[in-house]
Amino acid sequence: MGDTMSAFSDSCMNILGYAGVPDANKEKIYSKIKEFAAMEDQSAPDDAARRLRKELGSYFYELYKLVFFKTLEDRHIPEEIFMFLYFGYIDEELAGEENTQILHDLAVSIGHDEEMRVFTFYQWLRLIYSCKKDPSIDDFSTDYITTLRKRKRDGEITDQQEREALEDGEARVKFEIDNMFRSASKMLSSRVTTFVPFFSGQTLTKPLDKSLLSYATVNKMLSIVKGIDFSLFYRQTVYTAPELGLDKTFIQVEVLPDIILMPLVGTRGAMWQEITGAKRTTPGRFLLPIAEEEDLSGVLIKMCAEFRWELCKRIQGARWNDLSERSLTSDYVDYIDTYRKNRDLSTEAKERIKAAMVKHRKSYKEMFIADYMTYIMYESSGALRHNKVVRAILFNYCPFSKIIREGAIATNPQYVQLIERFVHKTAHEQHLFDIATGRIEKAGNAIPPELMAHYEYLRM
């Protein structure tokens, strides 16, 4: 450990120097970092502590920009810089010796996700800079393109400036840092009211090596959830192939979310957006702290629940709660609105719904999230927790995978009829699919991969 630590004897000055911070500002930031590191209680409620935390927060995001843009020109990025970019590390005293060692070891070995679905925030910004990914929405659910369009409409920029800004890597990255990064960091943090974005060992509630996430861990946990709710990330889209006699065929395509590991310690996750832009077959965005101190499965399931809800609202538009157009959200809203008169609910079930409404402040979305989490975590293994009405809604729109339908709940009286109805519906869809593909094969053509993928979906 000693050899590694000796290389980090003055990380703060090294990082500030790398960023090109002017000497006067460098000394000021350095002194504030050291003052913060020396505090016995960095979450102290007094005015001086609050001012210091606020000041450090204002330094962090501007420093992150400077460091990021400098790395674009550097083929030999120092290890301390990666530690800053991946984890928010700034100072060995603030982090603590053991934590500094752990962060160093991960920073030099982190690599890339082979499935290209999970990214560090630094990797994510590079994709945005190179226009391979678009900046995320801001706090008002407005994306970068819409923001530029509004600025042009308001006369702030010209048509030419708008076109240039769309491909301006620096402007794109600044939009991401100034909007999503600033807001999401505090949202994900384990200390919302006393949040400081620089990494501090004092904020940890468990050993750091037990909370740091890897690409493999996140991908594995997401696969477990998908193994229960198989249709979670599938979207219905239209497939056309006139040369095969297919003018308008509805198929299901899986669109997995982009998952970004944010450089902070936290206890939450955020389903930041359900799609990218206006196209419905684009990836959503899930955010996780790179050091997640809560149980990852619960955090991820909660994000998936919110994704289910928000994607349905997006697809349904203004009619998301209109029962004349049946959907997950409209059926669930009706269930909550009419529970008092619902004869399929026992008195005990009605009391539970009433209590849940109080707990979740009458938020349909929050109530659904809680019910979905129970459905995935308990009902999928045969441990019944739900009443028959909400169970039917969830199974109708979020059916369990085949291995669960034929396993844990196969003979459960509460699920037998639901499963039979699902099997009948799927068999009908498979029959129609067989007719369509039969015509294609009869004409001597190969079945397109998109249709084969849809066939696999029908067998899940």
Kindly give the residue locations of the regions a language model identified:
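Feature targets compositionally biased, intrinsically disordered low-complexity regions
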Residues: 1, 16-19
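Active-site-flanking segments in enzyme catalytic domains
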Residues: 9-12, 17, 30, 37, ...
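Long, low-complexity intrinsically disordered regions enriched in Ser/Thr, Asp/Glu, Pro/Gly
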Residues: 59-61
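C-terminal flanking tails of non-heme Fe-dependent oxygenases
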Residues: 226-230
